[in-house]
């Protein structure tokens, strides 16, 4: 997490708690010439457009008062969607037995990306059951090698 996203999270998290929303993710990216602050929120039963609008208004007010971002940017508040990021310990626990996509910093068994069913989670590793050709195999992945993890939609 970058310094900017950490600072934004400190500002936004109490606002989301007051609204009874979960702050799922904060991402600050540059795409072409534009900068985007993307904030994913959720709540029991999911968020709708009205929830995102309300959260966006509250976040805008707070960021205007104490903005850690020096350049102009677009604020995007949305649901995390079906491919929700997996970052926190509880996210990993909730994803057990579900399809996940994991990107790695370094290859494991020659691959830097794995798609499969999350089988196990502990402090050091996760185990993802993957299909290779017609066989299933458990891949043990050290948590410190995970660049990104998210829920996956498997068809």
UniProtKB/Swiss-Prot annotation:
Q: Which GO terms describe its biological process?
A: ribosomal small subunit assembly; translation
What superkingdom does the record give? Bacteria
Record's GO cellular component terms: cytosol
CDD domains according to UniProt:
YlxS_C (cd01734)
Its keywords, alphabetically, are: Cytoplasm, Ribosome biogenesis
Q: Where in the cell is it found?
A: Cytoplasm
Q: Name one Pfam family in it.
A: RimP_N
Q: Function of this protein?
A: Required for maturation of 30S ribosomal subunits.
Q: Which HAMAP family match?
A: RimP
Family listed: Belongs to the RimP family.
Write down the PANTHER family for this protein, in alphabetical order: RIBOSOME MATURATION FACTOR RIMP
Identification of the protein by name: Ribosome maturation factor RimP
Q: What is the lineage of its organism?
A: Bacteria, Bacillati, Bacillota, Bacilli, Bacillales
């Amino acid at each position: 997490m970058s310094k900017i996203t950490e600072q934004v999270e400190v500002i936004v998290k109490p606002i989301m708690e007051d609204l009874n929303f979960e702050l799922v993710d904060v991402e600050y990216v540059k795409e072409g010439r534009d900068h985007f602050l993307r904030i994913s929120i959720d709540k029991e039963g999911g968020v709708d457009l009205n929830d995102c609008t309300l959260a966006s208004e509250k976040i805008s007010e707070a960021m205007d008062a104490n903005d850690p971002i020096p350049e102009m940017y677009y604020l995007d508040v949305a649901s995390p969607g079906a491919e929700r990021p997996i970052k926190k310990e509880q996210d990993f626990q909730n994803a057990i037995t579900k399809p996940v996509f994991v990107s790695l910093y370094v290859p494991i068994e020659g691959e830097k990306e794995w798609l499969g069913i999350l089988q196990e989670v502990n402090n050091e590793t996760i185990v993802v059951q993957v299909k290779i050709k017609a066989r299933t195999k458990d891949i043990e992945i050290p948590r410190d090698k995970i660049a990104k993890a998210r829920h996956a939609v498997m068809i």
